[in-house]
């Protein structure tokens, strides 16, 4: 499984997301993938999973099926997300 966070790099929530990813990595040893919705590949990812609110975290299985999605703030707890990492 993998966890992806979709957020706009130039936004008011970017610092919060970066801090969360750093804390998540330190706590679990796993990385969260980043997607910028302003890039062509990021826009395609957002259309695929119907992501319209930022930040959004999404847990995907190995075949790309969505397992869980957390939209907006507050961000989910590290323990909630670590189950899927």
Put a short name on every predicted segment.
Residues 1-28:
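Local sequence-structure signature of Cys/Sec-based thiol-disulfide redox active-site neighborhoods
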Residues 7-9, 29-42:
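Thiol-based oxidoreductase modules, predominantly thioredoxin-like and allied folds used
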Residues 19-21, 48-49, 73:
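Short, glycine/charged-enriched secondary-structure capping and boundary segments
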Residues 27-30, 51:
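Short, well-ordered coil loops that connect the C-terminus of an alpha-helix to the N-terminus
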Residues 41-49:
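N-terminal beta-loop-helix "entrance" segment that forms/cooperates
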Residues 49-59:
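Structural micro-motif
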Residues 58-85:
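Non-catalytic, surface beta->alpha helical segment in thiol-disulfide oxidoreductase systems
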């Amino acid at each position: 499984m993998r966890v992806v966070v979709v957020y706009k790099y130039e936004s008011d929530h970017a610092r919060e997301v970066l801090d969360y990813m750093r804390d998540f990595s330190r706590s679990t040893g796993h990385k969260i993938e980043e997607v910028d919705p302003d890039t062509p590949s990021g826009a395609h990812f957002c259309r695929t999973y119907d992501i319209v609110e930022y930040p959004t975290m999404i847990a995907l299985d190995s075949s790309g099926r969505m397992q869980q999605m957390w939209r907006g703030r507050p961000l989910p707890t590290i323990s909630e997300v670590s189950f899927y990492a």
